[in-house]
Amino acid sequence: MPIKVENVSFIYNEGTPYATVALKDINFSIDDEEFVGIIGHTGSGKSTLIQQLNGLLKPSKGKIYINGIDITDKKVSLKDIRKQVGLVFQYPEYQLFEETVFKDIAFGPSNLGLSEEEVKERVYEAMEIVGISKELADKSPFELSGGQKRRVAIAGILAMRPKILILDEPTAGLDPKGKQEILNKIKEIHDKYKMITILVSHNMEDIARIADKIIVMNRGKIELIGTPREVFREAERLEKIGLSVPQITSLARELRKRGVPIPPDVLTIEEAKEHILRYLRGTKNV
């Protein structure tokens, strides 16, 4: 398994009166090319979990394997691990600091010992991937729109050419148009480059649409794990822990209560439409 997490627990301020358990007995694995969504309410442990995956935080207990390497082993170079695991923090545009878009994207690869030409190649490739025009290369990143800044920040990670891309709430604070553009671009990058992609979000609609697997976090533990259909089949369980389900799933549940035979794992409007039309045709023939 490219990513394997075994019995991981994490305690903030361990050994002090302020100790707080953030993760408890976490177990899961992620295969090559999987797109995984991690969802949960604020304080559920989502961000703490992803910071374990590239060594920013070290588990209080348990092991984490990236491509077969135990990254909790003190002998392992975390610098090498971070070349493989790219992490885009929430509001990544706040981490932009260089004079130009080009320099900001180039910062990471410039520290990999690459030649100037190789760095340039990676920067322009990353800009193309995220949809940032070359004309913006010499522009200050602080003059860009919120969505463009977000793309520049993601490009800075992609220029490192990671095998695993982790994004923490990548659409937070964006308007609906910017949000949709970023999500579409992330899915496009995943489909094209076949890297493992992990997307942290609290938005069920987003996750249902693009993830292959969903991990539901609750109070530092994994509440549910499975495909979108398997997870959203447990709508009542999700609502009990304060999470909403996709609107179409809620609609399907209400229609079932009224006798319309729609499966509990409907995820798209198209699916719901097919079941409703089938039902209506059937009632007309009675």
Swiss-Prot record:
UniProt xrefs under InterPro entries: AAA+_ATPase (IPR003593), ABC_transporter-like_ATP-bd (IPR003439), ABC_transporter-like_CS (IPR017871), ABC_transpr_CbiO/EcfA_su (IPR015856), ECF_ABC_transporter_ATP-bd (IPR050095), EcfA2 (IPR030946), EcfA_1 (IPR030947), P-loop_NTPase (IPR027417)
SMART domains: AAA
EC top class named in words: translocase
Membrane topology type: Peripheral membrane protein
Binding site for ATP: 40-47
Stretches assigned to the ABC transporter domain: 3-244
Cellular-component GO terms for this entry: ATP-binding cassette (ABC) transporter complex
Subcellular location: Cell membrane
EC number(s) from the headed UniProt entry: 7.-.-.-
Record-linked Pfam families: ABC_tran
Matches recorded under Gene3D superfamilies: P-loop containing nucleotide triphosphate hydrolases
A GO term for molecular function: ATP hydrolysis activity
Keyword entries, A-Z: ATP-binding, Cell membrane, Membrane, Nucleotide-binding, Translocase, Transport
Record note on quaternary structure: Forms a stable energy-coupling factor (ECF) transporter complex composed of 2 membrane-embedded substrate-binding proteins (S component), 2 ATP-binding proteins (A component) and 2 transmembrane proteins (T component).
The protein's role, per its UniProt record: ATP-binding (A) component of a common energy-coupling factor (ECF) ABC-transporter complex. Unlike classic ABC transporters this ECF transporter provides the energy necessary to transport a number of different substrates.
Family: Belongs to the ABC transporter superfamily. Energy-coupling factor EcfA family.
Entries under NCBIfam families matching the protein: ECF_ATPase_1, ECF_ATPase_2, PRK13637.1
Protein name: Energy-coupling factor transporter ATP-binding protein EcfA2
Source species: Caldanaerobacter subterraneus subsp. tengcongensis (strain DSM 15242 / JCM 11007 / NBRC 100824 / MB4)
Taxon lineage: Bacteria, Bacillati, Bacillota, Clostridia, Thermoanaerobacterales
